[in-house]
Swiss-Prot record:
GO cellular component, one term: cytosolic large ribosomal subunit
Subunit structure, as described in the record: Part of the 50S ribosomal subunit.
Protein name, entry field: Large ribosomal subunit protein uL1
Keywords: Repressor, Ribonucleoprotein, Ribosomal protein, RNA-binding, rRNA-binding, Translation regulation, tRNA-binding
Keyword Transmembrane: no
Native source species: Verminephrobacter eiseniae (strain EF01-2)
Gene3D superfamilies: 3.30.190.20, 3.40.50.790
Record has rRNA-binding as a keyword: yes
GO BP annotations listed: regulation of translation; translation
GO function terms (MF aspect): rRNA binding; structural constituent of ribosome; tRNA binding
Gene: rplA
Similarity section: Belongs to the universal ribosomal protein uL1 family.
Biological function: Binds directly to 23S rRNA. The L1 stalk is quite mobile in the ribosome, and is involved in E site tRNA release.
Amino acid sequence: MPQLTKKQKAMQGKVDSTRLYAFTDALVLVKQAATAKFDESIDVAVQLGIDAKKSDQVVRGAVVLPNGTGKITRVAVFAQGAKAEEAKAAGADVVGMDDLAAMVKAGDMPFDVVIAAPDAMRVVGTLGQILGPRGLMPNPKVGTVTPDVALAVKNAKAGQVQFRANKAGIVHSTIGRRSFDDAKLQGNLAALIDALNKTKPASSKGQYLRKLALSSTMGVGVRVDTQSITV
């Protein structure tokens, strides 16, 4: 485990780990702790009231953050013919079929998101062992296997984030950058929470949004009172 810097230790002393902060107060602390020379990501961890080991309690989806992520997203699309042209017109960075598959097999993957038209899955399906571990395998549940490749490209470029609860029932996601004003970060978090609520499994019982914490890339975590978030 990496050692904390003097600034991180000082910030830890300012954060009461037993307290639930209002979102705006938590954001002040998180931004104060984001002292790196680059524009740190503001991230959220949400503990859900699910049993992630049960197949009927899998939480997975995607949402376009209304204020973007602050990151340039590079998009690759597996498509041919008219669909390939639609993807290019929408701003895809790389479009192809067998030629794109060859790039992937060679380890040449200059992209962050992979989208596929349904008829391209015969090619994409052979790349599962490469794309899967990198979190790049297209999936209809998050809208990356779709006949509307143009819309998928536009969503990815506009700041769409994919989310999935891990084995502990925790969802990790970015909601923007330190340079974002508080209103934009709050708007992005509200969109994420709304998407999580919409994907709540019917078999999930009790409180669904159990815990929430904010942090920056290099900063400390701050627990947030979920009641302080307006969706």
